[in-house]
Amino acid sequence: TDRRRREADDLGLKPEDVVTVASIAEEESAKPDERGKIGRLYINRLHDGMRLQADPTVKFAIGDFSIRRITVAMTQCKSPYNTYRNQGLPPIRLPEKKTIDDILTSEPHNYMYMCAKEDFSGYHNFAATYEQHRAFAKKYQDALNKRGIK
């Protein structure tokens, strides 16, 4: 719609870029109320010139969406869809319109990192700094180890 095009332009994105960000955000979180924040985090990374480093793109590149734990080795797989290795936005899947709208209207924030919560609720901890992120990641890795998730 015209509204979505204007909102995408306000974010410095093409409409198709918003669709791609939305598709990654949907795969990243099963919690619809979190997807706008996740999408905005990826937009922050794009604007900062960072790689997205989005776990769903690794699952897509490997061809296995049942993976529960992304390893460092997995992030090195050679694929144009792997955003740990490649800059920019790859296609993943067609997102819901609501996710697109949630991203376009999400509150601006300074988050650059996220990690699944260690309580396995499906929600994420968000961080503005890499140091904060590492602390959250350690909690999550410890919880995975405690449950024997490889």
Annotate each PLM feature:
Residues 1-150:
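Bacterial extracytoplasmic/cell-wall-associated proteins, especially those involved in peptidoglycan
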